[in-house]
Amino acid sequence: MKGIAKSPANADYIDALPVNMLATPKEVLNSSGYLRSFPGIDKRDDVAGLSRGVQFNTHESVVYRVLGGKLYRGQSQVGDVSGAGRISMAHSATSQAVAANGVLTLYRYDGTTKTLQNWPSTVGDVTYAQYDIGSVRDVCRLRGRYLWVKDGSQDFGVTDLEDESHPDQYRPFYTAESQPDGILACDTWRDFAVMFGSSTIEYFSLTGSTDTSAAIYVSQPSLMVQKGIAGTRCKCKFGDSHAFISNPSGGAPSVYAISQGSAAPIATASIEKILRSYSASDLSSAVMETLRFDGHELMIIHLPGHVLCYDASASSNGPQWNIMKTGLYDSPHRGIDFMFEGNQITCGDKTEAVTGQLNFSSSAQYGAQQEHLLYTPLFKADNMRVFDFELEASTGVAQIADRLFLSATTDGINFGREQMIEQNSSFAYDRRVLWRRFGHIRKNVGVKVRIITSSPVTLSGCQVRLE
């Protein structure tokens, strides 16, 4: 469900992606699917700052967020977090861990706070080895231990079973030898520790050994993926495995999903054009996350100048992407760190110190109307007259009369004057969205549909009459 246009820069045909609209593959009124506006955002709370990270704590059954310089448990502040950049989170049966500013801090559920540090050098007549913990880049948890990535090295460390604020007493560090430039991120998959580098993704399994001289983790070469990630947040759990943005060191960046030890591309050519427009440093700052509601399985990629959304549930006939934005121009969507909380989907914010919650009865963001764009494919209409351009719309839910703006293109690049059509007003549930006299077409034609509204938008069944 996307249009076709031409690029004025290189004369290539490109996908005209829908903006703020999600495709739903469902039979409706002789159509194979329809497009529905992304839910709006209502304000929830004023908070300490911009959103830096989120995790659902399964032990406490509550969402932990880092907002500005504070850690929030639900809607209550429980601690201070240093720095201002993105953070990594993990949790155990006794603590919520936050890796920020190179330090791993454990916020225990009893109210105390600990940081990852070496055991005391001597306790009575017992001497403990002292290790170089380094700067913590990323953190995850597997079984009874936290795993942290030592920034700038090929090593990752594991905490002790007795006290998770200290490294393992006997064999705390392991090396991803296929990643000479250092591990960028870590995560878990089933019972494996996953180490993401710029050229490979390496898997480590537990050995189960109780011998203090034996390794806790051992590499599994059969699962290694010969692709790397672009940055620490450029991966997320998606489906049964992971999705990631590939590192430019392996060629032009793309988006891949890992399946059975291999990486399968899920990006289209138009998405890859957007990705390669960024420098390696800008691409490394991207953030990936997943979101699920109403049958949509979404993967959201937050880039510095774009927010891209992939819908796995609508991609059976090809990858279905759309663009998410805020306002009437090209500002990236302001919501980030979406999480199902209670019976609401809540989110942080990139631009203001607030949190929000999705409102499925609106498309407004914090009360402001949003722009929605759709494009039809270019179709042949050689020397023909076009009448009765019509869209099926679910109308009648607007508080004020909304207008839909239609404009045509004959070359796929330049769009003409917009035609305004009233498309939504209170209780007019059977209103037709109809442009009766479209005009004479010499060769090809395509249409852009633009709607600025705070009401939900549902469109399908585009059709015209040719003579």
Segments (PLM) and residue ranges:
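Residue-level signature of beta-propeller blades and closely related beta-rich strand-turn architectures
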Residues: 69, 102-103, 152, 199, ...
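Beta-strand-connecting loop/turn residues
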Residues: 61, 69, 94-95, 102-104, ...
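Beta-sheet repeat architectures centered on beta-propellers
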Residues: 1-95, 226-241, 248-467
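Hydrophobic or amphipathic alpha-helical targeting/insertion segments
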Residues: 89-125
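Short beta-strand segments and strand-loop junctions that repeat across beta-rich extracellular domains
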Residues: 105-111, 154-167, 201, 308-315, ...
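Beta-propeller and closely related beta-pinwheel folds
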Residues: 39-50, 76-85, 117-145, 149-287
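Residue position within the beta-strands of beta-propeller blades
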Residues: 65, 98-99, 148, 195, ...
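Generic beta-strand hydrophobic packing signal
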Residues: 54, 106, 116-119, 139, ...
